[in-house]
Amino acid sequence: MNPTKPSIWNWTQPQQDVPYILAISIGVLLILGLSEFVKRKGVSQEWSRKTAHIGAGLLAIPFPWMFKSVWPIIILCSSFFLIMLISKSMNFFQGVHGVKRKSHGAFVFPLVIILVFCLAQDPLHYAIPIAVLSLSDAMAALIGKRYGKHQFHTLGETRSMEGSTAFFFPTFLLVHIPLLLFTDTGRTECVLMAFGCSILVTAFEMISVRGLDNIFIPFGTWYVLDNYAAYLPEELAYRIGFMFILFIFFVAAIRYHIFTRTGAVGGFLVIYGMLSLGWDGFFIPALSLFGPLLAAVILHHRFGRERIPPMGVSHTFQSTIVAMLVLLIFDNTKQSWLLYPFLTASSAGTIIIALRIVKNMSLYRLPIILGLSTVSPLVALYSETHHIKDVRHLLIAWVGTLTAISIYWYSTRFQAILICPKCQTQTLERRHCGIETQILSGHPFFTQARIGLISIFCATVFCSLWVSQYA
């Protein structure tokens, strides 16, 4: 039987925790010393870093069974954070800090432990995410470094399919075995939960850079476990089936050079996130945007004369992040009027993606703008969602979408035009021919993706302020 968790903010018997605090502190120092020893023996930097990563994670896993309060964990993790900060500035512990790439993982790791401990209502929902972060992430890095042949790039960092595969299988076991042995969850549910969680967390790992996987992996694992625990086997099977459909769609999108691999992974996470957060009246209108977007892809494939650069993960997220934020607010507040700014943000983001696809086909721009701005409000209206309180608010959402596109269209005159030093091709992309591009004209801040994000945000705020007055 799992131990129940009392109020984590009450520290009634601190003297009982002192031996544990001292033991863990000594353990951390020994792990850092071992990492330095491994580095000085000539072992690769990645191995010495992951030695500390695995050791610190294994020390943190039993915290819910050792401590009744969060305060000892705050003391331990804050001390570790300060040690990492001071050692970084003084060039100590190069077994941890000596990695060549930019990484904030050593500083994020202790903060994440505190936050996951505070969020998790079940000890296993804390222990499993920390175990995945400690073991699966280390396995992915080491296998990818040694055997990674099929490489791809995400925001300047290199990943490999071998490393991601090495992340998936340990994650499946780390989720499946504890649920099977220490909970009342049925066998079928355990397999489905572990499979779905492994897919989603592996996707997060593929697009995380600069040590931010130390945030996305544990929070993603915790969130999926916390939500999947309430689902019946049929619901879990339905969601995994939807993942499979998305997988087929984005494989085709990669095949036709619409997305890069990481851009497709980002799109997969965004759409699945919309399903998870906004099934209640939000998801079907958002899903309807795929029809006109697919039409834009087909038009470009049939009649486009210039091959467009595939969309990366930054373009994907900057076109959809505002809609996802609206959904997160709805998930916490259940305010039905948020449907309208969501329609504005999702429609505008999809239009910007479509305009990028048909940028040299001016004949089709206006039909795409009108089609994509209209289809989502109409589907919301005729799907008879209970969130529709006033049809006039749909008109506000439609005006908000056109406002976003107008801001975007006007602002593109200020965007940075870049040139590739190697082939002298003008482009809007930060990288071309495998190297960094140089600014030819415009302001470096106003990239195409940032202009799109600013336009969507402004129009969504406009729609929210207008509709909220009548909510």
Segments and roles (model prediction):
Residues 1-42, 47-93, 106-154, 160, ...:
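Hydrophobic alpha-helical transmembrane segments
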Residues 93-102:
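Short acidic (Asp/Glu) patches
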